[in-house]
Amino acid sequence: MGLSEAEWQLVLHVWAKVEADLSGHGQEILIRLFKGHPETLEKFDKFKHLKSEAEMKASEDLKKHGHTVLTALGGILKKKGHHEAELKPLAQSHATKHKIPIKYLEFISDAIIHVLHSKHPSDFGADAQGAMTKALELFRKDIAAKYKELGFHG
């Protein structure tokens, strides 16, 4: 399930575009997640009150959280699958404190793919989409294993 070096390069090439505006990309990804899967909003006490897309777009807290999410994900992607040190605290907090089911990580992965394709179509063609999908699947598989170690079966 690992990625080739060429696939990692495709992932990191588009990720450089994301890093130019982590907050904007993150906010857009979270909005897509919450609109497509409203049940995910219930896991975020400070966002539960945001009912419309306009409210979400106006939320500085949502923008900040999007930045945080993508900063963490970028750190993981840059490790090219050697992300044990980065994954452990993330799995710990998401399993024990936030109780985020793996299914929700699938939902946000889909949102990431969609937003990257819509914002960067020339840099995110079929090969890059396939590589990013594999990278996100690897992340989810590894975090699911950590969840299991922690006794969380979300």
From Swiss-Prot:
It catalyses: Fe(III)-heme b-[protein] + nitric oxide + H2O = Fe(II)-heme b-[protein] + nitrite + 2 H(+); H2O2 + AH2 = A + 2 H2O. O2 binds at residue 65. It is found in: Cytoplasm, Sarcoplasm. It holds the Pfam family Globin. Residues 2-148 form the Globin domain. It is an enzyme of class 1 (oxidoreductase). Its main location: cytoplasm. Heme b binds at residue 94. GO terms for biological process: removal of superoxide radicals. One of its GO terms (cellular component) is extracellular exosome. Its EC number is 1.7.-.-, 1.11.1.-. Monomeric heme protein which primary function is to store oxygen and facilitate its diffusion within muscle tissues. Reversibly binds oxygen through a pentacoordinated heme iron and enables its timely and efficient release as needed during periods of heightened demand. Depending on the oxidative conditions of tissues and cells, and in addition to its ability to bind oxygen, it also has a nitrite reductase activity whereby it regulates the production of bioactive nitric oxide. Belongs to the globin family. This is Myoglobin. It comes from Mesoplodon carlhubbsi (Hubb's beaked whale). The gene is MB.
